[in-house]
Amino acid sequence: MILRKYRTEDCESIAGLFYETVHSVNAADYTPEQLNVWATGKVDLEAWDKSFREHFTIVAEETKEEKQDFGKRLLGFGDIDSTGYLDRLYVHKDHQRQGIASAICDELERAVPAEKITTHASITAKPFFLKRGYRVVLEQQVERGGLLLINYVMEKVVK
């Protein structure tokens, strides 16, 4: 696996990984209806690309030795803004629990001068962030498409 900075040509693959990951990995903690409003399959690629370019965004991809087919496969991605808000962190459904999210998160946490990192973690991601030293600040219900989804505002002091 290699970690590298985001490139615009990654955006479409990231959107696909996001959809598949949400609908498989998060299925144990959210209903199918909630998953459908969280990841609709219709991402505004221009808006996401702009956001990824404005943030510090890392992608993980297979190395030549790891790849199973033609082309490199995206394993995961994450992004953080200059204030220390960790916006997105997703790993391919077939590559969970292999240290990929930790490697991406390490890079993101080091990349910004903020003294504190904050994120809005799903029920599924909460244990991952707790193990990394984050604490729950608030449990909240977020409305998406008329449905409520539980997530957690979490923070970690890094400096």
Features from the language model and the residues they span:
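Conserved beta-hairpin
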Residues: H55-G76, D81
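A short beta-loop-alpha structural element at the N-terminal edge
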Residues: I2-G16
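Short hydrophobic/aromatic beta-strand element in the GNAT-like acyltransferase core
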Residues: H55-V59, F77, R88, T118, ...
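Conserved acetyl-CoA-binding loop-helix of GNAT-fold acetyltransferases
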Residues: V91-K93, R97-R110
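Conserved GNAT-fold acetyl-CoA-binding loop/helix
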Residues: Y19-E46
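Conserved acetyl-CoA binding element of GNAT-fold acetyltransferases
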Residues: D81-D94, Y152
